[in-house]
């Protein structure tokens, strides 16, 4: 079987890791696997045998945002046509909402077996801060993408949220929980690392408003806990700077350690006294499974 993953880059998030875990298993099963990344960013090692290509957008025109989706769909179409000279794709898995918006406009994939993979709770991510007409418009935009299409979600709650909050009906709606290679996970937890000695708390996740690092820092400041708080992750520089400034304002900057993205966070997780999770919502809390299975 020939399988294509499409994703908006591999910058080090949970969904990206899931995609590569699935790709590796398909390859072990003897399938031919391709991955098209829509950004030239990759923080993870790629599985051996993966056909990986980047279809990055080089447009720098002032009006590029107005034409982004249709332009990028054409770029994706060209890449798919080239790739299918070696055989048609039997299964196409689109991951992350921005990717889905582009794949939904693809002409080359219109007659393919396309599944849209949802990794998060959309109402929390896209409706939580919206009201009135703005909220209704966002609901309609999301509905247009997924209505009548094949959708797979990482938990039942993600699927229910999509149907109930956006009043849409997929052609097929399936739940497939995120995969974990438990044997490899436990081996990785034993690897050498630069984790600190002694007790510490840990949070693993990209710097994004939905992860609510602000709430985490405020709660940590109020807790009176002396053990340091280790933050593993990265994001936009301005977001990290805001968090660093908040730590200073709360007078905890000497106890909050920003350690960046770690390709293997498992030794850090295993060595922590406590794992903390502060997100507004999680489609599937990968790090919780990793924490429980790494000990």
State where each predicted segment sits.
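N-terminal strand-loop element at the rim of the active site
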Residues: 5-12, 17-19, 25-67, 158, ...
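A conserved mid-protein helix/loop that constitutes part of the nucleotide-sugar donor-binding site
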Residues: 16-21, 199, 203-222, 241-242, ...
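A conserved nucleotide-sugar
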Residues: 31-32, 213-257
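Short His-centered aromatic/hydrophobic patch
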Residues: 94-100, 118
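Membrane-proximal helix-turn-helix segments that form the acceptor-binding/catalytic region
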Residues: 132-151
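A short, active-site helix/loop in glycosyltransferases that binds the activated sugar's phosphate group
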Residues: 147-173, 180-182
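Aromatic "clamp/platform" in nucleotide-sugar-dependent glycosyltransferases that forms part
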Residues: 261, 280
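Short glycine/serine-rich donor-binding loops of glycosyltransferases
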Residues: 265, 285-289
